[in-house]
């Protein structure tokens, strides 16, 4: 990043405003969340934008994760408590049937003005998945990676079957989206190579600058292996 734009998430902010630069004094939507964008000009920082979701609601926790492109013109915001059962890009934001499914919102800055560009959901949206707990965008802003640490799929590896397993709750997943000619689409559905119950794969996520490498954290994975490429199937460190 060029260091002149800063985005700060405040996931417990309470305003019911929507969009950019709405009513900051409203406090009627507890824990709806907000993001504040600051810009540095001639060595001085000033707030440039107050950003809310397009479907603000209580307990969505918009701002639970944020990421900026290198030039600061693309902003990704996670809302891990968002409740729509929509899937894919720009689905039904007004649905409220999947509590804590989660969503990601993409905003673009043009001529100093921020506007929402896309509303992003998983291809297998599920209640409680917390999609948007972690987000990362590539340097050019054309790739987006999203973690959903409480997703329940049993697949392993890349683009496996997206079916929930009652025995693999919170195994976790990550999703990669790509922008081409201004249109976003899902490129990959990622699971750990040793998917297991409660691993929280997707609890942290990071794309390299060129988007060719992705790191995914699984903070409750249970192997006692050390170093690189150790025994993934060891389950001796059980979290109780």
Predicted segments with their positions:
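Conserved beta-strand/short-helix segments
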Residues: 1-237
């Amino acid at each position: 990043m060029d260091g002149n734009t800063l985005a700060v998430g405040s996931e417990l902010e309470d305003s019911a405003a929507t969009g950019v630069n709405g009513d900051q004094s409203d406090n009627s939507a507890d824990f709806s969340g907000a993001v504040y964008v600051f810009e540095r000009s001639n060595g001085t920082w000033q707030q440039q934008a107050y950003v809310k979701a397009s479907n603000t609601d209580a307990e969505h926790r918009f701002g639970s994760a944020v990421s900026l492109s290198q030039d600061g013109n693309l902003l990704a915001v996670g809302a891990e408590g968002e409740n729509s059962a929509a899937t894919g890009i720009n689905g039904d934001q007004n649905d409220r049937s999947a509590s804590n499914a989660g969503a990601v919102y993409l905003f673009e800055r043009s001529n100093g003005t921020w506007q929402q560009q896309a509303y992003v959901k998983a291809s297998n949206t599920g209640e409680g998945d917390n999609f948007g707990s972690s987000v990362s965008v590539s340097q050019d802003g054309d790739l987006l990676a999203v973690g959903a640490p409480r997703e329940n799929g049993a697949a392993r590896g890349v683009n496996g079957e997206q079916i929930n397993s009652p025995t693999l709750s919170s195994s976790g997943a990550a999703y990669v989206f790509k922008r081409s000619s201004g249109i976003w689409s899902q490129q990959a559905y990622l699971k750990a190579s040793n998917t297991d119950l409660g691993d929280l794969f997707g609890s942290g996520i990071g794309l390299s600058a060129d988007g060719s490498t992705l790191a995914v954290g699984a903070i409750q994975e249970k192997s006692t292996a050390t170093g690189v490429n150790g025994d993934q199937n060891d389950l001796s460190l059980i979290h109780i």
